[in-house]
Amino acid sequence: MKKIAIDAMGGDYAPKAIVEGVNQAIESFSDIEIQLYGDQSRIESYLVKSDRVSIVHTDEKINSDDEPAKAIRRKKNASMVLAARAVKDGRADAVLSAGNTGALLAAGLFIIGRIKGVDRPGLLSTLPTVDGSGFDMLDLGANAENTAEHLHQYAILGSFYAKHVRGIAKPRIGLLNNGTEATKGDSLRKEVYNFLASDSSLQFIGNVEARDLMSGVADVVVADGFTGNAVLKSIEGTAMSIMGQLKSAIAVGGVKAKFGALLLKSSLYDLKDTLDYSSAGGAVLFGLKAPLVKSHGSSDAKAIFHTIKQVRTMLETDVVGQLVEEFSKESDVND
């Protein structure tokens, strides 16, 4: 049985969206147990009772405006902290939260801990492509500043995730840059390019541009945390803007527009599904000793369900256990 600890109080619509997502997951998957951390009375008002769901009550939670590291240290009984502690103590196999991103990353690093050999775990998410296959990108903001060695390791981590979680035999690795030529970019990008090009274990395809990401140019895209986060927000904003513009155009377009929308209904739903990044799950802080997944702060029940599904896949494939073994081999070689 796969045990998942969930911060029920994190996110814009907690605990309602969190608990309703849990209800869907419990109904869909018979091999998971959920531990919900938070206000018991509020959780119970939305929970469909199940012997595979338990509640650990706490009145304390980390707010969106709390300073991450201080909150983790001072709010020792916060729902997020208790969920992370359950993983560290072996009472749960993975942790999920839609709460304060910085605090969750701090909980991952300070409570769960890094895998030996991983310098800086990267925040990885699967983002949409027009053909529906998606691509993995990291780092999405766990680290504002990176060295070339960090980005090389992100490529290794991303390739490993794509292979073991998404089932891509030879993931194509692209380096996000301001042009596709090998000579493009600043000194950091040029140094990273040389690292990746000389690593025979990676299927490195060269530099990729932001405009080509959603066309599926690569299976894994490597970026420093600052740039990756900016691109992530751009993709999210573009997806929301496109759907908003379509709705607005149909609403004010009169009878012809509404009739046209009716004829295109299935195609519009397909477009909506293609642009819906939440269906791929949350962002993984990959490189920790256990799966830690951040769901979007505005996640609804559907997004929480898909994030639980993602965590279940990570546990089913034992991707973290295999990653520990992989880095253990590298450490032995380096020693």
Curated annotation (Swiss-Prot):
This is Phosphate acyltransferase. It catalyses: a fatty acyl-[ACP] + phosphate = an acyl phosphate + holo-[ACP]. It comes from Streptococcus equi subsp. equi (strain 4047). One of its GO terms (cellular component) is cytoplasm. Belongs to the PlsX family. It is found in: Cytoplasm. One of its GO terms (molecular function) is phosphate:acyl-[acyl carrier protein] acyltransferase activity. Homodimer. Probably interacts with PlsY. Catalyzes the reversible formation of acyl-phosphate (acyl-PO(4)) from acyl-[acyl-carrier-protein] (acyl-ACP). This enzyme utilizes acyl-ACP as fatty acyl donor, but not acyl-CoA.
